[in-house]
Amino acid sequence: LLNKQNMKPEAYTKKMAKAFNIDSYRKGLSTYTDCVAHYAELVECCYTNLKPNTPASSPYGILFNDLMVFASDMDKNELRILKDELNQYYSLKEWLVKNAFSYIAKIISKIEKYFPAMFYGVTEEHTCPHSNQLYLVTINDEEVNADYSSGYEVIEKILPIVVALENKLSRGDINAFEDDRYSMDQFMKLTVGMRVKALQQNDVLKTYFLNSLNNKIRNGETHDNSHYDSEHQICRYIDFNNPNNMVEIPLMDVAFMTYIQFIRIMEIALVVNKILQRIWN
């Protein structure tokens, strides 16, 4: 419903009432933007309950928290100008509603399949492969590879905007890359793979997107170049750059990487929603 700009709030509330199996749903949702804000509240609730138990000061929390403060405190006129600049790279609203919300709903609908992988988040073990493997099978290789590939594409679309926001936050200008070889126009001309590679020059983004933008998994799924060893629970991917080389990742590590990717998508969605809601209201 949120994909339709002319959607009636009454239709949204009825849909939500049916989804939650209740007679009536929240009143006071009178506009399309109210409904988007409400859906974002549901995302925030899911995020709060599913995020890893890591301190806000950790490398995994710094960027998200700083961007939320940045979006909350910026002068509204300046924020509106920034939004117009960002929309050159991808529509914030379209990404939020059509890409992020849809992907989040899909993963939430089967989140129990990822519960074992979340253990690594609880123990703050973010580096893959993990030395202590769980050897549990709550999701198969085909499904987790497909989920990871889908999440990769969701992040891929919003990546230029996250880069621009980090530039603005850290250095005061969307074109001020940590590696001064780039501007946003130059970054946009890069292939997706080269954009991901360029992130390695930025310590903040490199750490933030750790595990979320693995080209080997994505290419293995996209080009049907992956194999599964059920005996050892290992996913094997043909290296796109070196076809004679196989990349091995334990199944539960792929699930953990997909879970972290999912967390990142929720965080970016909350930042984008904060920007849009301040401008809309």
What is each PLM-predicted segment?
Residues 206-235:
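Histidine-centered, metal-coordinating catalytic motifs and their short helical/loop contexts
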Residues 11-17, 186-191, 281:
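Amphipathic alpha-helical surface "interface" segments used
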